[in-house]
């Protein structure tokens, strides 16, 4: 084997061992999200933080108006219960579709670490889409990205929408920021310890937990959507969370019939957006 071939083999093995995604693994998923964004007036931006490069899509209709930011879920973090995915880019761009349906003048979509980014663009350590998906350094860079998006829109405030694990991120951000005027979660993982126990999977060691800061969200207008057919995040997770916020009667919770954790949200989203925050 020539020296060049040996070098190429070594490089390929290194990529496999570090868990980085090759272009062929994420290209189709990237094109799907990009297509939705392009058809609905969104432009692509890469936001470089201290530790991560985060992808965003932004649609600015009226500079100076509030900005609604949709935060992606955990994506394809695991290929099976025992095998970590080499690319956490979502297999289904559900959150991008929800963002595209939002009639607000200024809307942004924000991906999580490792999603929609090629090799070398962002850290390749799979712990940031598994056990440390809500680590302080992750939340810190997403927080900075939210500020960048807000400034891009010239927005006086932001409203956060988070799906699944993105709901956890949105809640954690809302607790640390002073410019958040509303919080919506969709099948949100608002207590990852409880969700891990429910699914009989390993706990997320090194991750911040939204339930621990729920009391800091008292007084913030919010709405938590629970899927009636959710087998991933049980309803008691949101119920326990809002009780800690101070909503003993669960008035900030809406149970959505005919949807599951993964499907059905798109068809109902416009109507769900009309439900006022509590």
Residue ranges: model-predicted function:
Residues 18-19:
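C-terminal motif of bacterial Sec signal peptides marking the signal peptidase cleavage site
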Residues 31-61:
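N-terminal cap/lid segment of alpha/beta-hydrolase-fold proteins
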Residues 53, 59-111, 116-118:
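Short, surface-exposed "cap/lid" segments of acyl-processing enzymes
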Residues 123-152:
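Alpha/beta-hydrolase active-site loop
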Residues 161-166, 170:
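Gly/Ala-rich beta-loop-alpha elbow adjacent to hydrolase catalytic centers
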Residues 188-189, 193-250, 254-257:
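The feature captures the conserved acid-bearing segment of alpha/beta-hydrolase catalytic domains
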Residues 259-268:
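Catalytic histidine-centered segment of alpha/beta-hydrolase-like enzymes
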């Amino acid at each position: 084997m020539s020296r060049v071939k040996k070098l190429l083999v070594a490089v390929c093995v290194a990529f496999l061992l570090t868990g980085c995604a090759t272009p062929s693994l994420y290209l189709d998923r990237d094109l799907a999200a990009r297509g939705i964004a392009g058809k609905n007036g969104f432009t692509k931006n890469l936001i470089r933080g201290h530790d991560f490069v985060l992808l965003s899509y932004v649609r600015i209709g009226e500079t100076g108006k509030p900005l609604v930011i949709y935060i992606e879920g955990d994506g394809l973090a695991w290929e099976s219960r025992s095998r970590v995915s080499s690319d956490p880019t979502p297999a289904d761009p559900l959150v991008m579709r929800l963002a595209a349906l939002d009639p607000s003048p200024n809307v942004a979509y924000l991906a999580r670490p490792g999603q929609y980014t090629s090799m070398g663009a962002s850290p390749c350590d799979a712990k940031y889409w598994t056990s440390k998906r809500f680590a302080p350094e992750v939340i810190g860079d997403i927080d900075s990205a939210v500020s960048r998006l807000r400034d891009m829109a010239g927005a006086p405030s932001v409203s956060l929408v988070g799906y699944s694990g993105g709901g956890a991120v949105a809640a954690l951000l809302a607790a640390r920021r002073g410019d958040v005027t509303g919080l919506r979660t969709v099948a949100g993982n608002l207590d990852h310890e409880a969700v891990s126990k429910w699914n009989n999977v390993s706990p997320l060691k090194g991750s911040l937990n939204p339930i621990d800061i729920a009391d800091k969200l008292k007084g913030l207008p919010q709405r938590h959507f629970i899927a009636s057919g959710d087998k991933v995040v049980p309803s008691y997770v949101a119920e326990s969370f809002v009780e800690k916020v101070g909503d003993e009667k669960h008035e900030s919770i809406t149970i959505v019939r005919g949807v599951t954790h993964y499907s059905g949200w798109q068809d109902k989203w416009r109507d769900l957006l009309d439900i006022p925050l509590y």
